[in-house]
Amino acid sequence: MSLLITSLAWGALLDPEVSSASKVALLDAVLEASTLLLRQNGSVRKFLALVAVLCLAEKTGSDNLPALILGSISTAASLSLHLETALRKSCVSNDQAVQTKRAMWILYCIDKSYALRWQTFSLVGDGSLPTTNPPDTALPSEVATTLSLEWLRIRSQYSKICSNILQLGVGAEGEPSENRSNRAVVLSAALEEWYGSVEISQMMLSLEHSDAVHMKLQTSYHYYEARFQLLSISLPDPRSSSPTGSQECREVLRRSIREVITGSNTITSEYLLQDCNHLFIQTLALSMLALDILLESDQGCGKENRALLSIVAGFFARVDIILPQSSIFEEVSNLIEILTYR
């Protein structure tokens, strides 16, 4: 039942003809079903259903996401799904075994992204996975396409970078700054290589224009979120003097902020409703911009920063029209006024 409700909610989310009230009602139904699902005894069917709900929760920014991650991990651990033999024993068919392996990788990816975003401990390690890489075989019994399998492989590569960034952040305090900087440079290069990879380019070329734009936005917000985290680790305490290296980091940070904010005009209202991560990365960029303006106390809000703040105001004005019940536009407007006229 939970899979059926989740499928209906996904369909409603992707269909612009469905009313907002219907979408909210279906998402509420998914939340209620997931609460009941978490109370059930552990089984492969429960695990697959939890991961399906987890994917939807990540897109919609559900407050239930941490509970779903923990519930999925607990279910997988109780069935020893990280072990090939135990996984196959728990599954009723080869097709279900492949789906379960794939679901383990999806859980891994979502866990890493969540941990990176909120700077918490990741709960799914590489040793928790039954295979070295995600299964890349589409099954006759499912609708999954080659592109969706390719995207899982691409995201799994990104998640491994996230894992390394998390490890760098955890060890940052007691580690010599030079060692930390060197590791950050290596990870930054790996992130750039991932973002400009042939696999992503080929996938874009195989998509229709609207789908390619959507996929480009999706890879972009993953890329910039990891980039912001890396730069935050690399930058010294704002109260300390800024050596040449940190000044270079600040320039990269400003360029990243500019790229994210100026790219907001390519995010359609439809995309905003389908994926709340677009809203998060714009909010993160605004926060970074605000901090940069406040740290440059002697220069005030320059011409370029005022232009960026105007773009931000336009973006969140659109959000206010799409989500009239939200107070975010008023809050952003107050912040922009403070930054502009302080």
Curated annotation (Swiss-Prot):
Organism domain of life: Eukaryota
Coiled-coil features, chain-numbered ranges: none
Induction: Expression is up-regulated more than 10 fold in toxin producing cultures.
Pathway: Mycotoxin biosynthesis
Keyword terms, alphabetized: Signal, Virulence
Cleaved signal peptide residues: 1-20
Physiological role: Part of the gene clusters that mediate the biosynthesis of AM-toxins, host-selective toxins (HSTs) causing Alternaria blotch on apple, a worldwide distributed disease. AM-toxins are cyclic depsipeptides containing the 3 residues 2-hydroxy-isovaleric acid (2-HIV), dehydroalanine, L-alanine which are common for all 3 AM-toxins I to III. The fourth precursor is L-alpha-amino-methoxyphenyl-valeric acid (L-Amv) for AM-toxin I, L-alpha-amino-phenyl-valeric acid (L-Apv) for AM-toxin II, and L-alpha-amino-hydroxyphenyl-valeric acid (L-Ahv) for AM-toxin III.
Additional free-text comment from the UniProt record: Gene clusters encoding host-selective toxins (HSTs) are localized on conditionally dispensable chromosomes (CDCs), also called supernumerary chromosomes, where they are present in multiple copies. The CDCs are not essential for saprophytic growth but controls host-selective pathogenicity.
Protein name per the record: AM-toxin biosynthesis protein 12
Organism: Alternaria alternata
